[in-house]
Amino acid sequence: MLEITSSSNNKCKYVKSLSQKKSRQKYGEYTIEGIKSVSDALNSEREITALYVSDSFFENEKFKYPKDISLYKVQDDVFMKMCDTKAPQGILAVVKIEDEADFTPNTEKSYIYCDCINDPGNLGTIIRTADAAGFDGVLLSDGCVDLYSPKTVRSSMGSFFNMRVVTGVSYEKLSEYKNSGFQLIGGGLCGNTQN
């Protein structure tokens, strides 16, 4: 375990940079905060590259740290600066962004398609609701907010790690899915019906 005592530490700067979409895209990683989210990620098949814990969390919480993941103990005030939330729980993880290239939908499964969702909290809530309702995945158009936004991940309340979420699904792809046997059912806020 390494200790971080300064916000000018390169690891601290790196973690903070991942709150920005361009850094997440550049490095292919994102952060998650909080005991539940980190525990859910550890219990999933996601690749966690590092865990950061505050001094007080390390001293007071009984948390089982995996031996195969880099662990950093961070001075409390420095940890606060690394986090996206105003009242962090004292633990965060850096997670690799999954490769989506191999996604092929299954006609035996059900998916929710989101078009142009621009609020990260709403997207996280949709992911959480889809998980609770028994859907097998969530498909996102290019017009949707960044899937790996800290607020999206946080709003999903751990469902982020239970659901298959695929980005960049165009209308053309939806048409292909329909032609291959999927039934498409749509809903919207316009108040009109359409075939």
Across the structure, where does each feature detected by a protein language model lie?
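Glycine-/acidic-rich phosphate or pyrophosphate-binding loops and their flanking alpha/beta elements
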Residues: 94-106, 195
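Short loop/helix-cap segments at secondary-structure boundaries that form the rim of catalytic
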Residues: 60-67, 103-106
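Boundary-proximal intrinsically disordered activation/regulatory segments immediately upstream
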Residues: 1-59, 144-145
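Short, charged/polar "capping" segments at the starts of alpha-helices
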Residues: 56-63, 192
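Short active-site oxyanion
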Residues: 26-29, 47-50, 68-69, 137-138, ...
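Short acidic-hydrophobic, aromatic-tinged amphipathic segments that line or gate anion-handling sites
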Residues: 2-6, 72-75, 164-173
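Glycine/small-residue-rich loop that forms an oxyanion/phosphate-binding "nest" at active or ligand-binding sites
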Residues: 66-96
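RNA substrate-binding interface of SAM-dependent RNA methyltransferases
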Residues: 43, 103-191
